């Protein structure tokens, strides 16, 4: 793995200012590493920001962290969420849904899905506290949400209109197993259930649209992140390797 490939993942999936000359094909080729490299990095940055700001803002830090999370992502995935919301609201044939998916204007469906996301995200972030578990929660949720979105792109054929979806699908063929294996240290038994249910829902949505796309992948990252996070918080990462690691760290003297 070369430094160029690593930097390319940060340049594509985040708003972190790194220079990369990699093409979209090169980024897609090595994107299977992004859940580990980018996901863990984002989780650590968000954790440090939360723990520092908690000393000043207390329990309200979760609201500020929402802005930090979206800034780190560059609002790119949020755009996919809005587009998907508009497409889901369309009653008609596939062509009308695709037109809504590609439309730059935001309709009622996009606003509605945004409100759903914000509601879940705010609840999840306000449940965080000043503890070691917060670090592991955020790392786990970032890794899982990125892995899920790439797994969708790798296993569901893209819509003809999505160049990004086509490239990622072609480059990730045969790597879906790797994406699942990467999850093992970070996923709890309960989030396995969340992963499966979310994938089944997106599979159904992709079926109505004719395939996957970059917008669907972005929406999947955005929506699944708070779901994974709130599940981790409720279950304390039970039955995961991270929970064992967290327990050992918290009991070191």
From Swiss-Prot:
Pathway entry: Cofactor biosynthesis; adenosylcobalamin biosynthesis; adenosylcobalamin from cob(II)yrinate a,c-diamide: step 7/7
Cellular compartments annotated: Cell membrane
Transmembrane spans: 33-53, 106-126, 132-152, 178-198
Protein name: Adenosylcobinamide-GDP ribazoletransferase
Enzymatic reactions: alpha-ribazole + adenosylcob(III)inamide-GDP = adenosylcob(III)alamin + GMP + H(+); alpha-ribazole 5'-phosphate + adenosylcob(III)inamide-GDP = adenosylcob(III)alamin 5'-phosphate + GMP + H(+)
HAMAP family: CobS
Membrane topology according to the record: Multi-pass membrane protein
Domain of life: Archaea
């Amino acid at each position: 793995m070369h430094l160029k490939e690593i930097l390319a993942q940060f340049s594509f999936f985040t708003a972190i200012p790194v220079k990369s000359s990699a093409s979209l094909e090169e980024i897609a080729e090595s994107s299977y590493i992004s859940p580990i490299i980018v996901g863990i990095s984002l989780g650590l940055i968000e954790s440090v920001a939360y723990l520092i700001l908690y000393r000043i803002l207390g329990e309200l830090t979760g609201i500020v962290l929402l802005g930090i999370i979206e800034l780190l992502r560059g609002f790119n995935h949020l755009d996919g969420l809005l587009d998907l919301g508009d497409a889901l609201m369309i009653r008609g044939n596939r062509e009308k849904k695709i037109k809504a998916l590609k439309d730059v204007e935001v309709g009622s469906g996009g606003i509605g899905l945004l409100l759903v996301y914000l509601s879940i995200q705010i609840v999840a972030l306000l449940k965080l506290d000043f503890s070691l578990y917060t670090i592991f929660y955020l790392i786990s949720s970032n890794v899982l949400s990125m892995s899920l979105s790439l797994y969708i792109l790798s296993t569901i054929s893209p819509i003809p209109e999505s160049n990004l979806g086509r490239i990622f699908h072609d480059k990730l063929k045969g790597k879906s197993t790797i994406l699942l294996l990467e999850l093992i240290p970070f996923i709890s038994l309960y989030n396995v259930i969340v992963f499966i249910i979310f994938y089944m829902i997106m599979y159904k949505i992709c079926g109505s649209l004719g395939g996957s796309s970059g917008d669907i992948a972005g929406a999947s990252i955005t929506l699944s992140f708070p779901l994974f996070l709130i599940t981790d918080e409720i279950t304390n990462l039970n039955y995961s390797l991270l929970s064992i690691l967290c327990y050992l760290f918290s009991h070191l003297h």
